[in-house]
Amino acid sequence: NTAFNSIAVIDADGTVLGKYRKTHIPDGMPYAEKFFFTPGDTGFQVWKTKYATIGIGICWDQWFPEAARCMALKGAEILLYPTAIGSEPVLLKDSKPHWQRCMQGHAAANIMPVIASNRIGKEVQGDSEMTFYGSSFIADETGEIVAEADRKTPGVITAEFDLDAIAKTRREWGVFRDRRPEMY
């Protein structure tokens, strides 16, 4: 039996569009997920929904810029990252700003909004404890955070984007036009 960390992609009308299986599985403490999950085999994909073409990475995938760029090249208009991140026992400081800046960079580099959801609360297993810091956020195509939830309470955040205007800006910047993949 193989277990994957997966997400089902369901459109606004309830149509199941597909699934994505998490590509990057962390192995270090406290996220020793390789004991439980197999790295995904779906590759990064995009789905055309009623509202936008979306790309989805799960948690640890967000730390890999290649994932965001791959989905952007496949036509994503918005990137989504459902996440479970919190206090890092191996770090002596709060990782929340680094976590947010990483995805703000994906938004700015790919000139598209990024939506990152994160859980809240505390999980205790034996002597180990982890507090998830919430702070779900939405960044616009420049990477600016335009909506953010707090660290401790459940919440819903929203933002509206003119995807046609963002696509025009993306073309004008020429980031995708001027790529040189033969040099990478």
PLM feature spans:
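Active-site catalytic loop in hydrolytic enzyme cores
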Residues: 1-78, 82-105, 172-173
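Conserved hydrophobic/aromatic beta-strand scaffold that supports enzyme active sites
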Residues: 6-9, 19, 44-46, 116, ...
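Short helix-loop capping/hinge motifs at secondary-structure junctions, enriched
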Residues: 15-17, 144-146, 167
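CN hydrolase (nitrilase-like) catalytic-core segments centered on the catalytic cysteine
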Residues: 59-157
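Acidic, His/Gly-rich catalytic cores of divalent-metal-dependent hydrolytic chemistry
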Residues: 161-164
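A conserved C-terminal secondary-structure "cap"
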Residues: 166-184
